[in-house]
Amino acid sequence: MNTMLYPELYKSLESVRWDMEKDIPWDKFDSALLTDEQAKTIKMNAITEWSALPATEMFLRDNHNDSDFSAFISVWFFEEQKHSLVLMEYLRRFKPEMVPTEEELDAVRFEFDPAPPLETLMLHFCGEIRLNHWYRRAAEWHTEPVIKHIYETISRDEARHGGAYLRYMKKAMTQTGDIARAAFAKIGVLMASARRTEKPLHPTNLHVNQALFPRDTIQSRLPDPDWLEHWLDEQIRFDDSWEKKVVERILHNLSILFERSFATAQELNRYRKEVVLRLQAAQGASQLPA
């Protein structure tokens, strides 16, 4: 039985692919509505999106036994690099002095330590949900028509990527059962508790290479490592109401995935403990003499 998801996902993503020349209204640009401060945030997001490159290298390394998922990552990588490119193209046309240098882009390409693939999958699923909301809020903050359109466009891509990751999470549960449930619930509790943390919980803000600590997050390698918190708190105003939307979306999807309703991170954590106990019981039973 062929359970590969890549052929269908490729067709689905291809059918809604946007063209950088034809689908972005470059001729609608209004220079009076773009400040240097705003252009700097566009530059930082362009560099951040470039980090799909080391993430792809990590995915391919840690999923070398999963050709289906690895093939999907080729599409994900293409679209994420396109996000970086369209933001850089915007700057090239309208704020050329802000275009990231090759050195600035290269700075965010470094090796990530190996990590459990199922936990990484869930982490990036949550990351896509968060980025979708960040970009939607950014589109509301900007008044310049072209960049508003760009953020709206790439936010929809992030939502579709999250949907694709969810398909692979369902597949993993079919294949490994409670092992996958435990991994997804563990990261889900962390990501749904984001309001209790000092820093934004997104893959680009997490430490991924112990030997390079503390410069082992994507954000720590940007020209302004503190830009993200300022962008979220002082510029696009990603406040508690928006944070609540992210958490609700994560819990909603996990409720569907696990076929059990979760309204809070605490409820999800109780479920996680149940799954861990089942795994421990199964492991203990398997070690009993026949």
Residue ranges and their predicted role:
Residues 1-290:
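Non-heme di-metal
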